[in-house]
Amino acid sequence: MRPAQTNQFDYVKIGLASPERIRQWGERTLPNGQVVGEVTKPETINYRTLKPEMDGLFCERIFGPAKDWECHCGKYKRVRHRGIVCERCGVEVTESRVRRHRMGYIKLAAPVAHVWYLKGIPSYISILLDMPLRDVEQIVYFNSYVVLSPGNAETLTYKQLLSEDQWLEIEDQIYSEDSQLQGVEVGIGAEALLRLLADINLEQEAESLREEIGSAKGQKRAKLIKRLRVIDNFIATGSKPEWMVMTVIPVIPPDLRPMVQLDGGRFATSDLNDLYRRVINRNNRLARLQEILAPEIIVRNEKRMLQEAVDALIDNGRRGRTVVGANNRPLKSLSDIIEGKQGRFRQNLLGKRVDYSGRSVIVVGPKLKIHQCGLPREMAIELFQPFVINRLIRSGMVNNIKAAKKLISRNDPSVWDVLEEVIEGHPVMLNRAPTLHRLGIQAFEPILVEGRAIQLHPLVCPAFNADFDGDQMAVHVPLSLESQAEARLLMLASNNILSPATGRPIITPSQDMVLGAYYLTAENPGATKGAGKYFASLDDVIMAFQQEQIDLHAYIYVRFDGEVESDQPDTDPLEVTNNDDGSRTVLYKYRRVREDAQGNLISQYVRTTPGRVIYNKAIQEALAS
């Protein structure tokens, strides 16, 4: 049993993290007082023992044990040692799933700028510093120096960019014997950026910007407002500008960037491990160069390479050359994992796969009722499997779940009969993405069909904005009796005839249906085959048409003693004939009537076409059913 989740939360807030906060995420103090959490080695696992290397990217001391209830050295095994920290290897005896959420960190030997805030659009670092992005990049990537403090030098201004030669010239002046220059400070790289950002007093800056905006106009005013908005956001969230330059970077849990052994003994690893390894290697090399007091040019080059390695880790390809793997494939950075359709948010958090659902291509089902849909058999047996198993056990056909599953997997004929019983009266919900209004999900009664495509009634297509050119739809099964009742009463397609947006009918015939109705009821005086024939009933007309004795549009007379409505009143007789038996035959424009001497109707023949008879019969049958 897993412990119940007690720490409920309302929302997730994304913001800048301070170096102290990043250390807090990964740092833990062991019972012996040792502080762990910093990843210092680029190694992942020992290829001989296949165990994680200590202080490496998969370190068990930092991230937790690789096996449940077992320390690294093997001194403690089994759940009875729960919570003990091994005094030999320093690994806590706990579940291995802690490796999915325990983090580490890398302490950088030199600060690096966060590429999102440097190269994003807009670039927040350049907005805050009120410098062009090109100049900020020149500083970060060690191409230009920047004046941090002009001192008493008249030729220098705060934030002025200097080339290598200009700085060497000024340096010579500073260190010459008769120099008058004092307090001149010049920096390069992210360290200089850190200093510039730390020097910004947000409240004062916001105050002066508000005063400036009052008198500014046009482009300058828009620029000032943009800068003020960024500064106000920093003040509101309690973030500091210098946090956009990182001195500590977090290492995500190892089980989120796994390393798995393949059949041939080789290992497949997440791209993040390669990117982290590059950062650690360059960071360690830089620390060593600083220790041995290496020449400035070498240290600067190493700092630039560290900046590029961290850029690639956070957002590969955002700036400079894209880091590629073994087969010239760009490595997936943290940004690539988060963003886009296949990213963590859209793929895993917003759109999850759910049980009792399926999806398939839709095809037209012209023989379906409006509240029905055709559900493929193999899909239905999977969706309704628990109900089928329950029915099989209750009916005594099998004794347990295992036997029922075996029966289903064998496609036993009795299973299909049970499935028919189960789905009777059990609505399913069909959804077509994108669900733009409530009619994007509707309930239908499933009808089992052969094949692998879902059959949909053509009249409900406008509500789903569906067509049959390869569209796919998802099926969901409501499980509880309450949800089934709700689906039947509120969501059934036959209950959703009017659009909730406009109040107009959304179920309207279109395309083939309109064309078919028009063709059946159209008049064509040129159709002469069988024209003028008399028929005793509507069925006789259809039979004659099927035997090809009459054309679909030929004018015929069919006996129909009921009331006849027409567009124009048909009351003026064209011809009246008196018969020998006292009755009379009256010929109107659209009918022929025989009456007795008192004017009572004996028989009536209506002029129509076989097409109209077929149309009439189809509507009558639909209404009757």
UniProtKB/Swiss-Prot annotation:
Zn(2+) binds at residues 71, 73, 86, 89. It comes from the Bacteria. Its EC number is 2.7.7.6. One of its GO terms (biological process) is DNA-templated transcription. It catalyses: RNA(n) + a ribonucleoside 5'-triphosphate = RNA(n+1) + diphosphate. GO terms for cellular component: DNA-directed RNA polymerase complex. Its cofactor is Mg(2+); Zn(2+). Binds 1 Mg(2+) ion per subunit. It holds the Pfam family RNA_pol_Rpb1_2. Mg(2+) binds at residues 467, 469, 471. Keywords: DNA-directed RNA polymerase, Magnesium, Metal-binding, Nucleotidyltransferase, Transcription, Transferase, Zinc. Gene3D superfamilies: 1.10.40.90, 2.40.40.20, RNA polymerase II, clamp domain, RNA polymerase Rpb1, domain 3. One of its GO terms (molecular function) is zinc ion binding. PANTHER family: DNA-DIRECTED RNA POLYMERASE, DNA-DIRECTED RNA POLYMERASE SUBUNIT BETA. In cyanobacteria the RNAP catalytic core is composed of 2 alpha, 1 beta, 1 beta', 1 gamma and 1 omega subunit. When a sigma factor is associated with the core the holoenzyme is formed, which can initiate transcription. Belongs to the RNA polymerase beta' chain family. RpoC1 subfamily. DNA-dependent RNA polymerase catalyzes the transcription of DNA into RNA using the four ribonucleoside triphosphates as substrates. This is DNA-directed RNA polymerase subunit gamma. It comes from Trichormus variabilis (strain ATCC 29413 / PCC 7937) (Anabaena variabilis).
